[in-house]
Amino acid sequence: MARMVHCVKLNKEAEGLDFPPLPGELGKKIWQSVSKEAWAGWLKHQTMLINENRLNMADTRARQYLLKQTEKYFFGEGADQASGYVPPPSA
């Protein structure tokens, strides 16, 4: 049976992640309170941030920026938006 969590991002009960996605306390916190669906949304958003901001993941500053954005996305005021991104019109 799947592990269920109350997802802080979606504000509903949903299937939890199989393992902490990051090392350390942030990874544990995400594992305990973020659903697979919300994590998939973060991965898409993270990809946009990397591409639009031309982040070099070999650069420590870029990795630190993404860690801060991860925490803001789930537990703060929301992550930065990609500078060139325009959301699709809602139907």
UniProtKB/Swiss-Prot annotation:
It holds the Pfam family Iron_traffic. GO terms for cellular component: cytosol. Keywords: Iron. InterPro entries: Fe_traffick_prot_YggX, Fe_traffick_prot_YggX_sf. Transmembrane segments: none annotated. GO terms for molecular function: iron ion binding. One of its GO terms (biological process) is cellular response to oxidative stress. Could be a mediator in iron transactions between iron acquisition and iron-requiring processes, such as synthesis and/or repair of Fe-S clusters in biosynthetic enzymes. PANTHER family: FE(2+)-TRAFFICKING PROTEIN-RELATED. Belongs to the Fe(2+)-trafficking protein family. This is Probable Fe(2+)-trafficking protein. It comes from Ralstonia nicotianae (strain ATCC BAA-1114 / GMI1000) (Ralstonia solanacearum). The lineage of its organism: Bacteria, Pseudomonadati, Pseudomonadota, Betaproteobacteria, Burkholderiales.
